[in-house]
């Protein structure tokens, strides 16, 4: 038994998990941000698959992977390296900011101050100060030394906030000395603060669409901005105005990188182009490369002869930068300036495929997916594993081929946002306890021929996901009773991430299946797991059965004029139609049939005697025939499948019954 903490004000919760390999060495979706530690050549990449990965850029080997940093469960939008590369700060769509030990790759602490997606970070190196901003219109300032000193007992942190933003913030920048901080938003303006006093200094107008990227000059006097309106603007903060508008892209500018002397702009755009432009002379520009997809982020390589670029795709490429040569002698004896050739791909960190399409099969146990490389895969949702790699086959044809004529209620939803299948269980629009099936249909490998068992998919899966959870303060089991963990049928991979989150809101808890046995994880689960989870996992309560009302009446071919009675019955929706046949044979015909020359008391004996003469050992479905909508019903179908595929009406399901030829019934 467990006394579970309840909170009336707690928001509705959902549980989700990811079907994936134990170690995902490749990004499975676009990469939003890059940070390079030039001291050791480590490149940190923030993925839309919720994973931060670390790469060795000093090796020429194709195997550059070092490690993964996992604790987010949604897109990682931005990262910054701090403390000379010892720590890393990350911002995510899961509404959190996380502090990491960059060398060992583990999450040190999680900041939950934001109320919506955290889109951008800014870093003042000289002050070890980080700012975070996002769709909640809020900007928070953090002291990095304080963040890295947080422990389980010393977990209180104070933050300053910058107020005044009126719309979602998508970009943020600070100069190294931390004297200027600039934000860009869907308000289409730049707002400037002094982070030392948190005072607003000014706002700058000029862009006509969202401001997606920003860079502040080291002295804090200039700002360069890129916008979805396709322009790059240079702003003089002393003059409080735009001093240069640069048109080099056909679509939105999403990433900016400046040369050390703040004279050249490297820009990446939705038009897939990466371009170098001289800031004071915008006509002096050259194309670095055309990427395969819209460019999301840019970062220098170690010696700054090349630029790393990320896109909507999962590959990370390094391109050689062209150099601006002012020492070319022209035909008239003067000096020309020209760009040396660039645009050569000098390195590539290959990414994996992102799942783009998904179909849930009618049995509601398997899903079929198609990824960005047209590979089709079958996943077993119940066992949380990849079941079959089908290759580049016809996705729609495969779904059609594998779909059976069976109806199981939806008990989960699938989210493909990270590029990997995330399965969501809840109690809102889709009830995770709605799928009751016979064990023969759901787990044929576990069938006991001596028993007739019904299983609930959602219950079994939650028990497997939380198999290792032993709640604190739980009463020890009776010595005569086994201490039951798991579901008794199967286990799921121990590396599976399990996430508890508010419905449509922030993440509350994330852990791996195997980690639920830990003291801190167990306590956290006790505090956050919703009652509907503990009811089945801890209390071992059985989810309620869903019932279907239906009518049962004689078929016109066997009914005499005086026999038109229509019975209304209610049964569990997973009951197979053979059970209805048994009811007709044992209850309806026996109770209401009076064979000629006999009386009601011996009607069952007479009907059974007739049946015996024709082979009474046959099961009920061999003697009784059910009809629905003028279609003979397969006795193996359950009630919900008949209602879905044959009845197809909102009114109560109606069956008609009649006897088969091998059953001699006098009422025919």
Swiss-Prot record:
GO terms for molecular function: deubiquitinase activator activity; ubiquitin binding. Pfam families: DUF3337, WD40. Transmembrane segments: none annotated. GO terms for cellular component: nucleus; peptidase complex. One of its GO terms (biological process) is double-strand break repair via homologous recombination. Belongs to the WD repeat WDR48 family. Catalytic component of the Usp12-46 deubiquitylase complex consisting of Usp12-46, Wdr20 and Uaf1; regulatory subunit that, together wtih Wdr20, stabilizes Usp12-46. The Usp12-46 deubiquitylase complex associates with arr/arrow; the interaction leads to deubiquitination and stabilization of arr/arrow. This is WD repeat-containing protein 48 homolog. The lineage of its organism: Eukaryota, Metazoa, Ecdysozoa, Arthropoda, Hexapoda.
